[in-house]
Design a protein with these regions (language model features):
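N-proximal low-complexity "stem/linker" segments adjacent to membrane-targeting elements
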Residues: 1-60
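A conserved acidic beta->alpha catalytic loop
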Residues: 60, 76-84, 125
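Glycine-rich, basic loop-to-helix element that forms the pyrophosphate-binding segment
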Residues: 97-113
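Short aromatic/hydrophobic "clamp" motif used to bind/position activated sugar donors
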Residues: 118
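Conserved donor NDP-sugar-binding/catalytic core segment of glycosyltransferases
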Residues: 130-161
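Short, flexible, basic/aromatic active-site loop/helix in glycosyltransferases
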Residues: 149-155, 163-185, 189
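Acidic donor-binding loop at a coil-to-helix junction in glycosyltransferase catalytic cores
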Residues: 209-216
Length: 285
């Protein structure tokens, strides 16, 4: 059965020289049509060494079906491959951020965004056509500061559709229970959107390697709810960056071991988390 992301998957993992010019031209044309002179929503892609995945992501963004005026921007986060050339080839406005970390990249995007609402986009992820409008049903509410969604993985030779279904079902159930008291722990950058002015007020953490998304969500809690959207049509599809070379079973066991330690914590609210030394950004020389 065809999937909505099959076209994007056909160029996923290919270098810019391997993607047909006709597809790159199509992406360029559609991206240009999406751009508004007065955007209400800023959609910002961050990319570090994503030459082989970025074009597929941008293809999905070029086919968004939204009623909101939007801008789509890119951030090249000190890439050593041809990520920047992908941005150039499809004509997407982008910014170079030399300081390395997702926090620096997202902060760069935030500083340059013009929209009232800000959508975080990861370059290795495909976004469904109605993603923006469905997320906005939550984010546009006055008592909501930010919103997140669930996400899926695409099946491949080592990850079956059935295995992914079971893995995601268990994971989603855990996240659903956790979000009542610890919603900030359920937020992932690839499926995260917030009100721009509030994020600029609290700022995005740039001193940590991971978790800048959840940290930002925690900082936004005094200004409004952390909302979650449970809708199949608002579920992006991504690769295996969070699983790596592990099998689904290995990843599942690892998650159970990690989450099983102090599992009762998910039933109690928390307003502050201590940083671990290994997650701190080391000073660049």
């Amino acid at each position: 059965m065809p999937k909505w992301y099959d076209n994007y998957l056909s160029i996923y993992g290919k270098s810019i020289g391997e993607v047909p010019d006709c597809i790159l031209d199509e992406i360029k044309s559609k991206l240009a049509q999406q751009q508004s002179d007065e955007p209400l929503v800023s959609i910002v892609v961050i990319a570090y060494n994503e030459e082989k995945r970025l074009a597929a992501c941008l293809w999905s963004l070029s086919e968004l079906q939204t009623t909101y005026p939007i801008e789509i921007l890119g951030v090249n986060n000190n890439s050593k491959d041809r990520t920047e050339q992908v941005y150039q080839r499809v004509g997407l406005p982008y910014f170079n951020e030399a300081k390395q970390s997702p926090g620096f990249a997202r902060q760069c995007g935030l500083e340059n965004a013009r929209g009232k609402y800000y959508f975080c986009i990861d370059a290795d992820t495909f976004y469904p056509p109605r993603y923006i409008d469905l997320m906005m049903t939550k984010l546009s509410k006055p008592d909501v500061a930010c919103v997140s969604s669930f996400w899926s993985f695409f099946p491949d030779k080592t990850h079956s559709s059935f295995g992914l279904f079971l893995f995601e079902m268990v994971r989603d159930a855990f996240l659903f229970v956790q979000h009542f008291k610890r919603p900030e722990l359920c937020v992932r950058g690839m499926v995260f959107a917030f009100k721009t002015n509030l994020a600029r007020k609290v700022k995005i953490r740039t001193d940590i390697l991971r978790g800048e998304d959840g940290s930002l969500a925690l900082s936004l809690k005094p200004y409004g709810k952390i909302a979650f959207l449970y809708h199949r049509d608002a579920r992006p599809v991504t690769g295996y960056g969070t699983i790596g070379s592990q099998s689904l079973w290995q990843s599942f066991v690892q998650h159970v071991k990690i989450q099983g330690k102090g599992i009762t914590r998910i039933f109690f609210k928390k307003d502050h988390y201590e940083d671990s030394d290994e997650n701190l950004v080391k000073p660049q020389r």
